[in-house]
Amino acid sequence: MQTPSSASAESEKDSGNTYVGPWLLGRTLGQGNLAKVKLGKHFQTNEKVALKMVYNDELEDKDTWKRLQREVTILRQLHHPNIITLYQVFRVPKYTVLALEYMDTDLHSMVVKHNRLDECTTRKIFRQIVHAIDYCHLHRVAHRDLKLENILLNKDLVVKLTDFGLSNFMLDGSFLSTSCGTPHYAAPEVIQGRYYDGCDVDVWGCGILLYLMLVGEFPFEDVTISNVLSRVCKGIYTIPSFVSSSASDLIRQMLMVLPTSRIKVAEIMQHPWFIADLPTHSRLPSRTSSFSSKHRSVTFSPPDLAILFDPSITSPSSSVGQIPQPTDHSALSPSKPMSISGTESPNPDPASLCYSSYEDLYSATSWHSDMAESSGFLDPTDIPPIPSNVETLRSSLPQRHASFMNKVYNHPLSRPPAPNRLRSLRWHYGIQTAKNPIEVLRKLCEALLELGARFRPCDEESFLKENKYKVFSCITCHNSPVYLVIELFSIGPSASVIDIRFSSSDDSIKYTSSYSPMPFLEVVKQLILKIA
């Protein structure tokens, strides 16, 4: 069977059928301002996919393009049975299309249909979500947009985590600051606009998901969004009595307002409720800190499109930042697939467009063996964070929300008492001091001058985000430059924390496995002695 042909590069019509590239378009699965998702069937193999069609006009916006670029980059890096698979990326005059793995339904539809789920079903789904999140964190990826609609399912309740558009890479010693996601799912530190750890935010999202599955409504639901955000920041919610004590305990540990008191993913996987009814041999061992550098095979049409998603590919006719336009329909034909390696397939097989990723996922070298590889990982510094804001969206459970609103208006508003003040932490990060921040900064500058350092404050755009001050410095130790990032955090009206970490942002020094930490430790010791 030959590829359908037509004068249109965007779509083809043959006996009433509409094609985009090699895919026959079906029903619309979802619609948004920037993109729409349609069901697609391959013209030869009949393989079903979900076609995420992003309007090219929207990609003229730099932030939108970076978001799409980051999503493709992350999906190429992650290999896990519970993470959605990306098969192909191609471009037509009106859309840039991502061919994604097709699933039967999502968790939102399932919760709406059944009102709430039993604990056995909830546990089966929640385990897969946590395993996927743990794998993301192992590869230094924070999802940051966990919600019912982003958890896809098939008829066998196999979970696939999707929509990595708001995800970000995490660097050692660095925090994230972008406010993103949906208000009902947002963590307190995100709502307050403070710096946060992406792992802690994902744990909060897991807590919201678990509550929704067991109860059928949001834990912090209220009449107005402002009240919702206030309840989130204060941690005001109740757990119905029909939820088991073990599940309630796990929810409370995940929905701790203070991020440092929040349970970690590894601890979730050892919680009694999580491992209940799970055979001992099936319990996952402690993960290692290895990273995989193997990327999934993804085809690009036209071939120049691959350059935009992988800077290592070079072409004399295209450069990064220029979006290529197809000149004829042959660029969309499956007879010219291009892998990310940048080489054309001499004997292309149309079925490979669909099954190459299946082979990667379910072959003998599964994702477990990928985790054992430690040759490196994707450099996240190539993709800068994109600014965003928390948006006020409609409730994703409209029927439950309407019922809650009627109940609130028919009865006086009652709030549970605020939780008792958490006891002070016995452990803290960095060097804690009770001195005035201005005095600490003065001593810090004097110490840097005495050590012969060159230093500068952060730029105005990232200057002092309410509770943080940053200084970049360079100190010479044994004829070797040591670059430092010194941050002063305010953790209360009478306490501050100084954090000193190594920086590899300068081109003259790159952090590698062979780099000795001794100059850094020597400089930090001298600096601490000066300001003590």
Swiss-Prot record:
<dbReference type="Pfam" id="PF00069">
    <property type="entry name" value="Pkinase"/>
</dbReference>
<dbReference type="GO" id="GO:0004674">
    <property type="term" value="F:protein serine/threonine kinase activity"/>
</dbReference>
<feature type="region of interest" description="Disordered">
    <location>
        <begin position="316"/>
        <end position="349"/>
    </location>
</feature>
<dbReference type="InterPro" id="IPR000719">
    <property type="entry name" value="Prot_kinase_dom"/>
</dbReference>
<dbReference type="GO" id="GO:0005737">
    <property type="term" value="C:cytoplasm"/>
</dbReference>
<dbReference type="InterPro" id="IPR032270">
    <property type="entry name" value="AMPK_C"/>
</dbReference>
<dbReference type="GO" id="GO:0044732">
    <property type="term" value="C:mitotic spindle pole body"/>
</dbReference>
<dbReference type="InterPro" id="IPR008271">
    <property type="entry name" value="Ser/Thr_kinase_AS"/>
</dbReference>
<keyword id="KW-0067">ATP-binding</keyword>
<keyword id="KW-0963">Cytoplasm</keyword>
<dbReference type="Pfam" id="PF16579">
    <property type="entry name" value="AdenylateSensor"/>
</dbReference>
<dbReference type="InterPro" id="IPR028375">
    <property type="entry name" value="KA1/Ssp2_C"/>
</dbReference>
<keyword id="KW-0206">Cytoskeleton</keyword>
<protein>
    <recommendedName>
        <fullName>Protein kinase domain-containing protein ppk9</fullName>
    </recommendedName>
</protein>
<feature type="binding site">
    <location>
        <begin position="29"/>
        <end position="37"/>
    </location>
    <ligand>
        <name>ATP</name>
    </ligand>
</feature>
<feature type="binding site">
    <location>
        <position position="52"/>
    </location>
    <ligand>
        <name>ATP</name>
    </ligand>
</feature>
<dbReference type="GO" id="GO:0005524">
    <property type="term" value="F:ATP binding"/>
</dbReference>
<keyword id="KW-0539">Nucleus</keyword>
<dbReference type="GO" id="GO:0005634">
    <property type="term" value="C:nucleus"/>
</dbReference>
<feature type="domain" description="Protein kinase">
    <location>
        <begin position="23"/>
        <end position="274"/>
    </location>
</feature>
<feature type="active site" description="Proton acceptor">
    <location>
        <position position="145"/>
    </location>
</feature>
<dbReference type="InterPro" id="IPR011009">
    <property type="entry name" value="Kinase-like_dom_sf"/>
</dbReference>
<dbReference type="GO" id="GO:0005829">
    <property type="term" value="C:cytosol"/>
</dbReference>
<feature type="compositionally biased region" description="Polar residues">
    <location>
        <begin position="316"/>
        <end position="346"/>
    </location>
</feature>
<keyword id="KW-0547">Nucleotide-binding</keyword>
